[in-house]
Amino acid sequence: MQVILLDKIANLGGLGDQVVVKSGFARNFLFPQGKAVPATKANIETFDARRAELEAKIADQLVAAQARADKLEALAEVTLVSKAGDEGKLFGSIGTRDIADAISAVGVEVAKSEVRLPLGTIRETGEFDVSIAVHSEVTATIKVIVIAEA
């Protein structure tokens, strides 16, 4: 199915690209989320008329994401307290939700889907660098310090 993308989508394309995708992906994901429209003549003409408006909207989103990333970088570090054994092994683990909640408690709203843990959940005490993907093009790195509960 031929579609016109209304947003940048990883591994697919950017604004205005006409791509061929499977019809189920288009009907179940792209169309409901407003990320694409079918590539009909009428939609192509409508898109060409709205292109500047959509590009301005995406630029505004990028500026807002950069501002959030700057706030996150200003935080520098977040400390989490968890129960741990003698050798620093945690009883349980610290995942994306725990990190997102801790950052949000400090004052910068972060969704758990934005937190990137490349090595999986944190299972020991120490300092860890965690990436926060605030936008597809903007990421911020924050230091997470995990200490044992006294």
From Swiss-Prot:
One Gene Ontology cellular component: ribonucleoprotein complex
InterPro entries reported in the protein's UniProt record: Ribosomal_bL9 (IPR000244), Ribosomal_bL9/RNase_H1_N (IPR009027), Ribosomal_bL9_bac/chp (IPR020594), Ribosomal_bL9_C (IPR020069), Ribosomal_bL9_C_sf (IPR036791), Ribosomal_bL9_N (IPR020070), Ribosomal_bL9_N_sf (IPR036935)
Keyword rRNA-binding: yes
Pfam families: Ribosomal_L9_C, Ribosomal_L9_N
UniProt KW keywords: Ribonucleoprotein, Ribosomal protein, RNA-binding, rRNA-binding
Gene Ontology terms: biological process: translation
Key word rRNA-binding present: yes
One Gene Ontology molecular-function label: structural constituent of ribosome
Coiled-coil intervals, chain numbering: none
HAMAP family: Ribosomal_bL9
Protein role: Binds to the 23S rRNA.
NCBIfam families: L9
Annotated family: Belongs to the bacterial ribosomal protein bL9 family.
Protein name listed in UniProt: Large ribosomal subunit protein bL9
Native source species: Pseudoalteromonas translucida (strain TAC 125)
